[in-house]
Swiss-Prot record:
NCBIfam families: PRK10271.1, ycfN_thiK. Gene3D superfamilies: 3.90.1200.10. This is Thiamine kinase. Belongs to the thiamine kinase family. It comes from the Bacteria. GO terms for molecular function: ATP binding; thiamine kinase activity. The gene is thiK. One of its GO terms (biological process) is thiamine diphosphate biosynthetic process.
Length: 274
């Protein structure tokens, strides 16, 4: 249920107007992040979400709502309310683990997602890379960073192998191990893109695990594993630049030192892979 309003409302106003019988579950935070919190009434639970990035355009949050509205409930939470700065979705019971599931199981989930109808908006990385450069701390902008940005701009993004709806933030913390199977949460980066971009972006533990995931996916998708792996590798420089730029952007936005450490580590990976 989308609800149009140009006037932001508070958390208390949201609950009293739309969920008067629900109350926040203050002692529960499993699988929740950002400004999310859980509400409950007679055993029914919803997650109340806000945009993770307060400076992101409102369209990004609306895209997330639209993606969840068309995805099947077997892989994603169903949304119940959208309005400015707030979204209410189903709570997915299950376990959020600290490590990825078996690669074949994860490949099955991603392949099923990629068989769904496209969302209707494309994921393009270059505008994000340029935004993160512009919004980063000027003292952190280096000649090497600018050189790599220009190199990617000239090369252009790899041509998609297959264009499908993507989640684009697949890691252990966004996977719910439920009684009915694996499900994905936090769809804020979802959009249409290359299946190899999704596979390249999975937060794996090592190259061996990554290769196995790609091989398992290739078997399901009837693609030669070597062909799919080559396409995944074409996206690596783009994704490393995306991660480094995002960490730099978040450092300037929050002042949190962890983002500097993550950015420095990603820059080192970029130098190694050049």
């Amino acid at each position: 249920m989308p609800f149009r309003s140009n006037n932001p409302i508070t958390r208390d106003e949201l609950l009293s107007r739309f969920f008067p019988q629900f109350h926040p579950v203050t002692t529960f935070n499993s699988g929740l992040s950002g400004g999310s919190f859980l509400i409950e009434h007679q055993g029914q639970r919803f997650v109340v979400r806000q945009p993770h990035d307060p400076d992101a355009p409102q369209s990004a949050f609306l895209h997330q709502y639209r993606a969840l509205s068309q995805l099947p409930a077997c892989i994603a939470p169903k949304p119940h309310l959208y309005l400015r700065d707030w979204m209410v979705v189903d709570y997915l019971p299950g376990e959020v683990k600290t490590y990825l599931p078996d690669t074949n199981e994860l490949a099955g989930l991603l392949y099923y997602l990629h068989q769904q109808p496209r969302f209707g908006w494309r994921i393009t990385l270059l505008p994000l890379l340029e935004l993160y450069w512009q919004q980063s701390d000027p003292a952190r902008r280096t000649v090497g960073w600018l050189r790599m940005l220009k190199r990617l701009r000239k090369a252009r993004e790899p041509r998609p192998l297959r264009l499908s709806p993507l989640h684009m933030d697949v890691h252990a913390g966004n996977l719910v191990h439920s009684a009915s199977g694996l499900k994905l949460i936090d769809w804020e980066y979802a959009g249409d893109g290359d299946i190899a971009l999704e596979l390249a972006a999975v937060w794996v533990e090592n190259t061996e695990q990554h290769r196995q995931l790609v091989n398992d996916y290739a078997t399901r998708a009837k693609i030669y594993p070597a062909q799919l792996w080559r396409q995944v590798r074409r996206w690596f420089p783009w994704l490393l630049m995306l991660k480094a730029g995002w960490f730099e952007y978040r450092w300037r936005q929050t002042g949190d030192q962890q983002f500097i450490r993550l950015a420095d580590d990603t820059w080192r990976q970029l130098l190694i892979k050049q």
